[in-house]
């Protein structure tokens, strides 16, 4: 085992604080509408330019092991905030730095670190409750756009596109962000349920120009197993022909004679029909077939339930206003399922989302909710160069996460003002002893740090701005760093999601509390320069004559 270096007491804490400061100073320059960019070197390709706090934090690795430990702990703050709220990583980093700085000063002055931490925790609980009380619901699409705009560093176009996408697919809908090949940023919306399976034969195509199959007012047969013969289905097919409605068959596979029979019937014009494979694999396939059944108001023909194709009747089939099939995708629009049943299915899947521990499963379950509840929107981010596209994509991702958070827990005044106003609720809060009271005052002072940083990044004195806002009794009064004006932040459109502000503070206080209570640090001792791995070879002098 390698030898270890151990640092204690003030030496350990000072090293750790240096690492915290290096990382936080690099991240906090990005905060606010006039925050600067950070350029990240990449081992291949062009450097990456970003204003995303967590992207900057993740790149930082320090040479000194003890400083690096401090930096990594603050990196954890940014990562956790990003995972929970999707935005607010820079705010969380600034808060963590402010709490750690003041906390370590108090420890150096002889205060008990554990009591300081208890005071910090007491204050955090109180402020989080105040933020939740101050939050109000997002009232309209314009406010969604404002949240997106603020998070995208003031780019109104991004905020508007996210608001439009959310309006079309609903708050539960899936919105994905991709890179566009062109210069423009575009939004495509797929309403209804879409899955990645196309037609099994090009002979099913009804629109030869677009190479798509379009079925209006269509009935849907859902079968769990493979179809290799249509013989058992003949009575059903005769009823379908009489109904004069197109039929879509979704099964594990349709092959051989069954597929040939369908194609021949389609070409002769006797039957308007198409067949696609069921989406997914294994248990997920069964679940998705059940989703489609609920969406279309039909039943899955499953041998597990004792159903046979021979006994299928028309009332077991689902239906939809429109179904469009390309060679790769099938979209079911306006299924005939009961609204109450669809809502019950969505609630059931949500329960599974809460219980699952796998990120992959959670993502797939969320997709299923979106397909049942709303639809899918894709925002394709464009730009002049690859570097610009990547930088804008970061901002769109942040803005999208912020708008989702706003819809979940409501909005508060932006620009760091919500934290300062919530801090006023700490007046009169006392701990069990003086050291805990100091912990409370550390949080109160730290709550001003994001506001000060936003002001300083805009070239204004942060202390003056913080003082003016502290003195005001109007909870909406704040400083708009974009225009350098004071006034009603809601009227300016400067708003933040309550969830982002709350999460940033909770994560910052949690990690900062751990750093303050650190008394010793252990790290690998660096290897001595020049020593060969095996202790070096003995001198080989005098052997020059060997052949």
Curated annotation (Swiss-Prot):
Domain of life according to the entry: Bacteria
GO cellular component: cytoplasm
Biased composition regions of type Gly residues, renumbered to the chain: 532-547
SUPFAM superfamilies (alphabetical): GroEL apical domain-like, GroEL equatorial domain-like, GroEL-intermediate domain like
Residues binding ATP: 30-33, 51, 87-91, 415, 496
Primary site of residence: cytoplasm
Intracellular or extracellular location(s): Cytoplasm
Enzyme class: isomerase
Disordered: annotated segments: 527-547
One example of a Gene Ontology biological process annotation: protein refolding
InterPro entries recorded: Chaperonin_Cpn60_CS (IPR018370), Cpn60/GroEL (IPR001844), Cpn60/GroEL/TCP-1 (IPR002423), GroEL-like_apical_dom_sf (IPR027409), GROEL-like_equatorial_sf (IPR027413), TCP-1-like_intermed_sf (IPR027410)
GO molecular function annotations of the record: ATP binding; ATP-dependent protein folding chaperone; isomerase activity; unfolded protein binding
Family as reported in the entry's similarity comment: Belongs to the chaperonin (HSP60) family.
Complex formation: Forms a cylinder of 14 subunits composed of two heptameric rings stacked back-to-back. Interacts with the co-chaperonin GroES.
Purpose of the protein: Together with its co-chaperonin GroES, plays an essential role in assisting protein folding. The GroEL-GroES system forms a nano-cage that allows encapsulation of the non-native substrate proteins and provides a physical environment optimized to promote and accelerate protein folding.
Protein name: Chaperonin GroEL 2
Species assigned in the record: Roseobacter denitrificans (strain ATCC 33942 / OCh 114) (Erythrobacter sp. (strain OCh 114))
Source lineage: Bacteria, Pseudomonadati, Pseudomonadota, Alphaproteobacteria, Rhodobacterales
Gene: groEL2
């Amino acid at each position: 085992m390698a030898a270890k270096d151990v640092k204690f007491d003030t030496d350990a804490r000072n090293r750790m604080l240096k690492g915290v400061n290096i990382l936080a100073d690099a991240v906090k320059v990005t905060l606010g509408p006039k925050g600067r960019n950070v350029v990240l070197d990449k081992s291949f390709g062009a450097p990456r330019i970003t204003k995303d706090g967590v992207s900057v934090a993740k790149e930082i690795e320090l040479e000194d092991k003890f400083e690096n430990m401090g930096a990594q702990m603050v990196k954890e703050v940014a990562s956790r905030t990003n995972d929970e709220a999707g935005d607010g990583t820079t705010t969380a980093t600034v808060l963590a730095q402010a709490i750690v700085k003041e906390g370590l000063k108090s420890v150096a002055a002889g205060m008990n670190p554990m009591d300081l931490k208890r005071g910090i925790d007491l204050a955090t609980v109180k402020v989080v409750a105040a933020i939740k009380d101050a939050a109000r619901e997002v009232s309209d699409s314009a406010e969604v756009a404002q949240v997106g705009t603020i998070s995208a560093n003031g780019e109104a176009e991004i905020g508007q596109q996210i608001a439009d996408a959310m309006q079309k697919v609903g708050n539960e809908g899936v919105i994905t962000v991709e890179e566009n090949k062109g210069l423009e940023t575009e939004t495509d919306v797929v309403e209804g349920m879409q899955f990645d399976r196309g037609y099994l034969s090009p002979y099913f195509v009804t629109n030869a120009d677009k190479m798509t199959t379009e079925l209006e007012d269509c009935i849907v047969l859902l079968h769990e197993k493979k179809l290799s013969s249509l013989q058992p289905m003949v009575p059903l097919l005769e009823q379908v022909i009489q109904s004069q409605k197109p039929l879509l068959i979704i099964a594990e596979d349709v092959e051989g004679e069954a597929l040939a029979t369908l194609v021949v019937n389609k070409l002769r014009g006797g039957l308007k029909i198409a067949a696609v494979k069921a989406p997914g694999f294994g248990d997920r396939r069964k679940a998705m077939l059940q989703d489609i059944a609920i969406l279309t108001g039909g039943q899955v023909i499953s041998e597990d339930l004792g159903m046979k194709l021979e006994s299928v009747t028309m009332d077991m089939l689902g239906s939809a206003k429109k179904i469009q099939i390309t060679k790769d995708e099938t979209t079911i629009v306006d299924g005939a399922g009961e609204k109450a049943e669809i809502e019950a299915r969505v609630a059931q899947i949500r329960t599974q989302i809460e219980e699952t521990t796998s990120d992959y499963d959670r993502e797939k379950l969320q997709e299923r909710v979106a397909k049942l509840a709303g639809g899918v929107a894709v925002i394709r981010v464009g730009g002049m160069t690859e570097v610009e596209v990547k930088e804008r994509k970061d901002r769109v991702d942040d803005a999208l996460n912020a708008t989702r958070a706003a819809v979940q827990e409501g909005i508060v005044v932006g620009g760091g003002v919500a934290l300062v106003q919530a801090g006023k609720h700490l007046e009169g809060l006392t701990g069990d002893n003086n050291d805990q009271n100091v912990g409370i005052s550390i949080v109160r002072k730290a709550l001003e740090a994001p506001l000060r940083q936003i002001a300083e990044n805009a070239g204004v004195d942060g202390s003056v701005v913080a003082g003016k806002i502290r003195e005001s009794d109007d909870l909406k009064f704040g400083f708009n760093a974009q225009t350098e004006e004071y006034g009603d932040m809601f009227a300016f459109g400067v708003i933040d999601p309550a969830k982002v502000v709350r999460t940033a503070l909770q994560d910052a206080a949690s990690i900062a509390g751990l750093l303050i209570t650190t008394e010793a640090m252990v790290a690998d001792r660096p290897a001595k320069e020049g020593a060969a791995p095996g202790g070096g070879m003995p001198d080989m002098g005098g052997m020059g004559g060997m052949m």
